[in-house]
Structures are given as C-alpha cells and as structure tokens.
Amino acid sequence: MGSMFFKRARMAAGALALLAAALPAAAFIGNFRGPKVDGDLAVPGLSAKVRVLRDEHGIPYIFAQNTPDLIRAQGFVTAQDRLFQIEGYRAIATGRLAEAVGEAGLASDRQIRLLGLRRNAERHARLLSPEARDFLLWYAEGMNAYITAHADDHPVELKLAGFVPRPWTLEDMVTVLHFVNWSQAANFKAELGMQKLIDKFGADKALRDLLPMNVNPDRKLQPVIVGSAGPAVPLAAQDIELLAGLDEAAAPMAPLAVGSNNWAIGKSRSASGAAVLVNDPHLDARMLPGIWHPVGLFTPDIQAVGAALPVVPGIQVGRTAFVAFGVTNAYGDSQDLFIEKIAPGQPDHYVDGNQVRPFQIIEEVIRIKDKDAPGGFREETLRVRATVRGPIITGPTSGYDGDTLLSLRMASAELPGGGIGIDQLLTARSIADVDKAAQAMDVIYFNYVFVDKAGGIGHRSTGRVPVRASRQGSHPKPVGSSDDWQGFIPPAQMPGTMAPARDWVGTANNDTRPDGYAFDYSSYFASSYRIRRIAEVLEQGKGMRTKDQLALMMDAQNLQAPRLKPAMVAALQADAANADFARILEAWDGRDDKDLAAPLIYHALYERLVYETYVDEMGDKLARNWLGNWYAWQERFDELAKTPDSPWFDDVRTPQKETLPDLVRRSAAIVRAELQARHGADASKWTWGDEHRIYFFSPLRRSGSGRDWLGFAEQPMSGSGATLLRALSPFMGGFNVEFFASMRLVADMGDDDKVEAVVSGGVVDRQFHPHQKDQLPAWTEGRLLNWWFAPQQVEAHAVKRQELVPR
C-alpha cells in the first residue's frame, strides 16, 4: 500500500518515543504481543465453532464446518492481523481520509469524490447476485465481529493515525473493489501524457513517433501501434498539469498498477509430472508488513492456501485441491478521456453531438478533522459536474475555466454484471472453471494464469474493456455525434489461451493479443524483455523442480541490454575519456548483478541517454513526465536506437547535427562525473549495489532516524526493471528500488503437502510484532518457506491454536 493514508501516522509518531509516550505501558506491550491468537474467543455471527491454527510464521489456517463461517472467520482473522491496514484502505477508497487525519487527507478525498468511486460502488452493490452479495457480506460480518466485540484488542496504530473503526457495509466492500480497479488503471495517465505530447508536437508527429510500441513475441506481425489513425485535438490552452492530482489519488494503492510475472508449466515439463503455477506480483510493498495476507482456508468442501488482499475474501493467489492460480496486471484499457465543449452562452450545459445537455451536478460533502472547528470537524462541499460519459476532471475547481473540458469515462461506472468471480475460485475444479470465474470478473483487471490437477494450464485476462468505434484509446478524443463505446469485449474473447501445445504459458504485463485480434484492447503494456526471458528458459525446460522455478524468479539476466550495449560500446571506444566504460560494458554478460560495475554504468548511461535524446525538444518538465512512465516509451526508444542518425538524436539547440554515438558520449561524461563524485575515480570498483538498494519501512517512520530499526535495514539488490528479478527504480530518480516481488509463490500440483512461498514482510501489521517482518530474511536471501496445504501438516506445524466460538 502507498503512503497517503500513513502520512498522518508518520507525522503523529515523529519518532518511536511518541509511540511509547502517547499510550499506557499495557497498551504498548499489548501491541508488541499482538492480537489474541490462542485459546477460545467469542465471535458473534458464527453458526458453529471454527479452529484457527497458526504456524511458526504466524500464518493462519482456518478450519470451518461450512463456507459462510469460513469466510466470516477469514474476515475476523484478517481484522485481527491487519485492522490498521484495512481501515486505511477504506478511508482512502471512500474519500473519508480527512475525517480521520485532517488536512493531510483532503486532497486525496477531493479526487476520490470527484471520480465517484463510492457512487459507482453503490450502484454496483444493488446489482450483485445473491451469491456475490453473501460472499462479501460474510467477510464483512467477520471484520465487524472483531471491530465491535474486541475493541480492547485493536492495534495502537489506529489511535496514532486517527482512525476510529466502524462496522463495514456491503457498499464499503464494493468500494474497495472499485478502488482496486482504479489503482490498476494505467491508461488514464498514459492518455494525459500523450495529450501533452500532442500539444507540444502536434498530432501527426506525436502519434507517428511517440505512441507506445506493443510487442508480443508470439505474434508474427510485429509490432502493433494502435490509435495512430484516431482523431487528436491539441489542447494547448489547457494546462493539463492541473490533472496531476488525479494521478496522485491512486497513489495509496498505485502499487497494484505496476506489474508482475506469472507462468505455468504442464506435466511434460515438470519433475513431479504435474502442472506447476508460479507467481511473483510486483508492487511497491516497502511499507511493512506488505500487501498480501497469507492464509489457509478449509471446510469439508474447500482446501485452499495462498495469499489474499486484505478486504477481499478468498485467495487471489494460491492453490486449492483442484486448481492453482496467479495474477499479473493485464492493463486492459477501461478508461477514456473525452474532450467536451461547454455550450455557447450556457455555462451549465455542454454539447453532446447535435444536442445540448445540462451538466449533472453532484455535491459531495467532505468532513475534515479540525481541532479549531466546532465539534472538532469542519465541512467542505465539492461540486462535481458530469456529462453522460462521466465526471468533468477539469474546470473551475482545478483552476481552469475555459470552454474545453475533459471528462473521464470508466467501464466500472457502467453497470457491471451481478457476479464478482472471486467467489468461484475456491470451488473451481478445473481450468475451465477458473476460466469461467475469470470471465465473471468485471471490475478487476488481471492476467490470470492457472493450472489444474489433471495437468491443464491456461490464461485469461479479466475485466470489462469497451469496444471502441474509433479503435483507439491512447489519447483524449473529441465527443462525436455517436457513442464511441459500442458495448464491451465479450469475456470469452478477452486475451487468453487454454492448453497450449508448448505446455507452458506466462505473462509479464506484456501484450498477449495474438495476430489478428479483433479489438482495441489496450495501447499500454510492459516491454517484452521479461516475457522473452520466461520463454527462453521455459522452452528448454524439462524435469523442472521448485528450485528451478525459484531460480527463474531470481533471474537477473537483462535481455534489454543487448539492444543498446553494442552501440554504447562502439561509441565509447572512440572516446579515450571513457575507454574504461567501454571495456567494462564489453565484458559484461548482461546480468544485473549487485556486485558488478557494468550494470551501474549501463543503467545510469541508458537513463541519461534517453533523457538527452528528448529533452532538447520536450524541455525538462515534459521529458521527465513522459519518461517517468517506462512502459510508454521503452520499446519505442530501443527500436529508435537502430537508426542512429534519427532526427530525434540531433540536439536542436546546437548548430551541428548529433547522432546516437554523440549522445552516448555526452551522456557518459555526465554519468562519470556523477558516479565519481559518489564512488571514486576507479569505475572498475563501482558496483550496481552501491546505488541499487532496497529498504522496508514502518508506517511510523518512512525516513530519517530510526527508519531501519522500525523497518528493515537498507541493502544492495540485484535485478532491474527489465529482469525477472524485478527491481524497478523511478526514472532518473536514483536507483533505490520501489517495485519488486511482493510475494514469490510456487504451487506444484504434485505436492499435496505444501505451497512454497514467501512475502516481503509478514502477517501482522502491528509495530514490533514478531510476525510483522519475519519473512523478510527468507525473501532477501531468495528462499521460499513452506505454507502448509495438507491438514495433517498444518496440525503438525501449528504453534498457536485458537477456537472461535459462536456468541
């Protein structure tokens, strides 16, 4: 989870001394010990007793006699372990953060209320099927049992952050699902970026030279560039920087938008003779205890072990007795920006084709904690205007009051179906059943990869993606006389494959559309380097064991580097001042190893080279903004490097004509000066790990004194944004790692004792709790832990035993 809702906690805590001073000693010690997890505990709402066993890592394994009690108990146990986290999720997702933390949460609340996530969720909740409604309500009932009946057991962090827990409703649950949907969406940001480029260069040049290049190694026709024929309108008078707040609104769960790897191998490639599922979701999970909550779920009909997102029932990654499944972000384009016009002389109306319509006006009242206000709160009314497409995201409230506006249309706002899909995963018995469940997921945009006990493997992308008459969603489009959205891609025609002949399947946020795909699914995907490495290894894989799958997750081989390294070496060999760079890079095998000098030189040089290529024409602000979105430009730039005399490499600020080698040498001089200042003159003694580092922090102390004590000490890390060992840093923002494998999991359907997995943190979100970060040593060392699957193994390894008793 991101930083927004923890700002208040960090400000309030300041230092550990505040935590100790603000609370009675008994409360402080209770927080260290954590929730009561042994003995009997009364739980309102249960129909029968439920047993909860915990292993040495604190992972709960829940044994219930029926499904309703199982999911209620999961909600209860999740609240025991993660109440601080789930209350933060709700405050952000519902636009009620300022009510808890005051002014620090107001900007987030304004943006969330403008988007209307709660309004959309309330409509969605009314449409849910009885099965979906029950599944969500059972979980809410369990959380509420802990919130209302065990207030003396709540974590002290709630008080520090200003949260006052209250019972969860069905609408709260659905709102969180819609927030997950929003936080996964990346096309909105990409559309804004492309509009800025259109404003700068004009539509022809921007769409011809700068649209993302989408590569699927399995396609014969390469590459695909979509949207180039679509209409584009310059908005030069419009300062769309004013929209930056909408991007920031997704920050609290923006980690969900980044990436992941998943793959599966069939029987012919595994040592066990059974199918194997592998998943390592890439998120910003530096804030402890991480995002995923490991859990085991057992009834007479259900046997499941894996990881769940707190507030989402069931498991999102893991296995059952019959199937296993894992997820990556699919980047299905579910949002569009539309260029709207205010009706001449009618400021409260807009032009819709040949009609003039009144804006829908929605008033959102935001409650803000304020010690100087009567009763401790003040109120602000936000006036939201909306067209038939969606809310206006520009206008007087953002400081712009022209006659051209942008509206945001979201598929999640357009009455999804009654199912949620996630409730079907626990009872799926085959890959066909998982595929059916995936097709029912309207508001979650994942690439599911899955396997079954019979050896079947498959993949399906989820969510609702509009069928666009314009066949483009890459940049804002003017409102026309007819609706651009002509329904949605049929779920069975979303990208996917079942039982491929090669007996493996994988995704890495890449373009998975085959040749001739009929729909404009998206214009925004990860570069192809990770999926190419997966294919390179799995195509040769025979008799693969769990250790082989782990080795592939930890693989630091960079397949992007060979595209640029030869040009870099050639340019540097002609430059005596940088001959050592040339020697180091030429000898490099392409591994982004933390102990090598070459990766540091390569990545620093690559980033500077890309920046120098575009800054002369874009300017610093636009260049950094666009290049900060790696997926938007990387394949495009790497292809551009094949043409070293491209006009883009010419610096228009100088009288001479520069080429790629000239910019390589210029960039090398800048990089050398920066790195020498930090690490000394001898480049051969530098290492990637000198700068490419990762740290984990407590919500109470993100930086400064005590950060490593409350969190987990900073350390060097191998990998990069282009490797399967994902370790992505912000563009030109230093090399500290922000996005990485938040969990690593291998589910071998031939091993009925266990799933082997690890999370980048722990189970419990309480400061100083022994299970807040106890899986990090294994994670940093590249080891997997046993998450027990067989009930007898759970019994044998239980160190805590609790019975939840109906009340």
Describe the residue ranges of each PLM region.
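Glycine- and hydrophobic-rich flexible loops that cap the catalytic core of alpha/beta enzyme folds
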Residues: 257, 297-314, 318-323, 327-484
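N-terminal Sec-pathway targeting helices
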Residues: 2-18
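Charged, long alpha-helical assembly modules
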Residues: 605-689
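Proteins synthesized as precursors that undergo proteolytic processing into mature forms
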Residues: 118-119, 140-141, 412, 420-446, ...
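Terminal end segments
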Residues: 520-579, 662-807
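Hydrophobic alpha-helical segments
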Residues: 335, 397, 404, 443-541, ...
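Substrate-recognition/specificity elements adjacent to catalytic centers across diverse enzyme folds
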Residues: 24-276, 281-284, 288, 295, ...
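Gly/Pro-rich active-site capping loops and adjacent beta-alpha segments
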Residues: 69-107, 111, 326-377, 381-383, ...
